[in-house]
């Protein structure tokens, strides 16, 4: 069986989007697709649509409801949607532009509280009091939320969208990803970690239509590197940096001082991380750098100012 990747385009809600179409060719020359491969190309299209129109992603829609401590049906009532609409959005349906903007706006808890007050006639007194109390708690915690957003802006140069493979921007996920890699591979030089993260993200995009770390990458002389990699590796107390002398050169190794909490990662994400770590664990920093130099993702974008496009995931040779 041979996997075939072909550039295609699709009109979605009146707009044309480019994507990579995935099919399989058997020994008799017959081509076919699977539910999974069709899902990957559809994700490429719908994620571009979400990014273009600032429509929240599925994980953001779920996280918003959980932050406010409400059921999906109650969110629909307060937002003025159909009874099951919010639940459908949590299952992957893409909101309309107007509903997407509504969901985006109520990520501000004060805006949501105004809507709760406007919907009071549709809530029991007990429901109303409980929701208001929760929203007051959320608003009181806004300083903590703004601190997290400041850290996100500091670590992730590119916002969520095409440049970062549509991955969530989360410092907790990034920290635990680093800790997990170090737990699997042991102390790891920064130069090697750069390539490991690249392969994890680009393999994830190829297999799922979405990256994992939230990072975007540039192609420099020594291979693909995450944007702001120096800030990333110094951002977490649980990731220590140690200078070591290797062949008369000072190199910085990363060491984990805590165990990773992988509760925020899916089974599919963890399987991809494990696959890359297993393949790269025995490679030296020099070996993995040489491997990355075989990648069209690096060769086609060396010394260019823009980030490496995630569409290059479909030309990976190292994994």
Question: What are the language-model segments listed below?
Answer:
Residues 64, 78, 89, 232:
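Residues in the recognition helix of alpha-helical DNA-binding motifs
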Residues 101, 111-319:
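Domain-edge interaction signal
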Residues 56-57, 81, 98, 173:
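Alpha-helix N-cap/N′ positions at the starts of helices
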Residues 93-105:
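Short, basic-rich loop-to-helix N-cap that marks the start of a DNA-contacting helix
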Residues 1-53, 123-126:
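N-terminal flexible/basic segments that precede or flank functional cores
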Residues 54-69:
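Short, amphipathic alpha-helical "recognition" segments used to contact nucleic acids or chromatin
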